[in-house]
Amino acid sequence: MLTQVLAGALLAAPLEFREHTIATDLKGGYQVVPCDVNHDGKIDLIALASGMTELVWFENPTWERHVIARDLHGMINLAAWDMDGDGIPEIVLAHEFSMRAKESIGIVSVLKHNGDPRQLWNIQEIDRLPTSHRLRWADIDGSGKKVVVNAPLTGAHAEAPDYRDRVPLVFYRPGDWKRQIIDDSSEGLVHCITITDWDHDGRDEILSAGFTGIQLYKLSAGRRWMRTEITKGDPAPWPKSGSSDVAVGQLGKERYLAAIEPWHGNEVAVYRMSAVAWQREVIDASLVDGHTIVTADLANDGTDQIIAGFRGQPQRVYIYSFDGKRWNRQTLDDGGMSAAACAVADLNGDGKLDIACIGSATHNLKWYENLGPAKRTQP
């Protein structure tokens, strides 16, 4: 089902943002991660650029640049979390990545500060798994002790364009960092993983998006991993099938999924649960090399908007808002951001979620200040 998205400005007052440029020299910008790096209560931004050999972070509020580590090649993804409770996050990094599995070393390393996060950090290699591509921290057993989930892009013997091979999904526990298998039955290509407490039981589940669609992985009470297919994604023939990126959002009390489809695709698809199954609605089919999708309550009204960005021309970032009947689109950035990744956080402490995006072809990092109303309080 294809629904033509309508310009939000024609139907409702658009959300208002003020654009701020932080950096313009991040060659191959690929990921931006908001977190408090220096334990001062302000949300900083870690910027990963695949065309650079330095991993850097920008300190809020002046956005002074600091180098975390040097001489890193083929950086592709990171996840940050304070695993030792000192107030400063540890970083798990995937590097030495290549799209060609046979040439992808797939190094996974842990980076830890030396007492001053503004100085160079220590690096410890923990694994080598070809095409290691997406890393996320997750509390899989509800203990509060998170593990690192690693989703390689493809299997070790996969070749373009079909990438026919089994793709492992693994995790590591801090300490011994031993690789443990979650699943190795998925085929093709897996582009994204998203961590969510799917059934509200205090334990995180894993959503993956790839050629076989959107899958859910859950650790059972018997400590066995269970895999459930949520949706097959785009119904086109392989390798144009499935999903590329997925996010979980809320329309009041109703949960929905937002996805870019197919891999690096042109569609923004929304999935809402009917009586028996998830129903797919394509709300936009105009993206060119879609690469990031995020959901967040930008209006502070209990309903999540969708933020989607694409790397190809004309290089735009869109926001989609639901008015009760249809999704309305507004442009956040028109031509100035080839968005490889966007993230949301309250960057200026005013109670509103702001947006940060990093551009691949545009080599830049921006944050978009939310000028809307603060969170409503109960009378």
What are these regions (language model features)?
Residues 1-9:
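Bacterial N-terminal signal peptides
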